[in-house]
């Protein structure tokens, strides 16, 4: 009888642990709500302070390591967007200065490695990077010393009624080391 109670207690404790583990998930960013401005927002969103933006972003270069399309219902496609469309065209890199971003991108159609500089501003009220013509922006989701997660405007597509709608991606960026950045600059200067 004691053995049966012991097994029952073990079973109850295991079920409780599994229940708590499934409730405490880091997947809060795996589902977005579409805001009135049409931009997806994560369910749990905390703005990134100006101090953290300066400390973690400015002066560093970041490489796209994951890109996932955000669907109209706010869910994220599991398949990597880069592989899905292009067989992975090569990651983009973003080097942030105080007021400019140098964007390094591989153009597989030519093929060529190109880079260009864009001006940006950081809107601290809603964490959007905007270049001069409001065409390209990120919305920061989370920032650490090594990883940045953003919502990225990718393009405009047509909807079923023939109108235009924005296409957004959930993107994970990793910070480059000084050596990696030097290698990127050398590769893209040729």
Model-derived features: positions:
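Sec-dependent bacterial lipoprotein signal peptides
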Residues: 1-21
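Bacterial Sec-dependent N-terminal signal peptides
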Residues: 17-55, 177-190
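Tryptophan-anchored aromatic micro-motifs
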Residues: 35-85, 118-120
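Contiguous, well-ordered beta-strand patches that form the walls/edges
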Residues: 68-73, 84-156
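Beta-sheet ligand-binding and adhesion/scaffold domains
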Residues: 131-190
């Amino acid at each position: 009888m004691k053995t049966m109670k012991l097994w029952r207690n073990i079973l109850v404790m295991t079920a409780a642990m599994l229940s708590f583990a499934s409730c405490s998930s880091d997947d809060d960013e795996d589902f977005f709500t579409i805001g009135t401005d049409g931009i997806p927002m994560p369910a749990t969103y905390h703005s990134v302070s100006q101090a953290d933006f300066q400390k973690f972003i400015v002066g560093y270069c970041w490489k796209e390591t994951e890109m996932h399309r955000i669907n109209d219902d706010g869910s994220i496609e599991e398949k990597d967007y880069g592989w899905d469309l292009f067989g992975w065209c090569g990651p983009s890199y973003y080097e942030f200065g105080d007021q400019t971003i140098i964007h390094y991108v591989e153009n597989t159609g030519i093929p060529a490695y190109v880079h260009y500089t864009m001006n940006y501003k950081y809107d601290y009220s809603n964490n959007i990077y905007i270049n001069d013509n409001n065409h390209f922006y990120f919305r920061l989701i989370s920032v650490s010393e090594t990883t940045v997660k953003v919502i990225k405007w990718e393009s405009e597509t047509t909807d079923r009624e023939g109108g235009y709608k924005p296409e957004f991606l959930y993107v994970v960026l990793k910070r480059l080391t000084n050596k990696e950045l030097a290698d990127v600059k050398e590769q893209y200067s040729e």
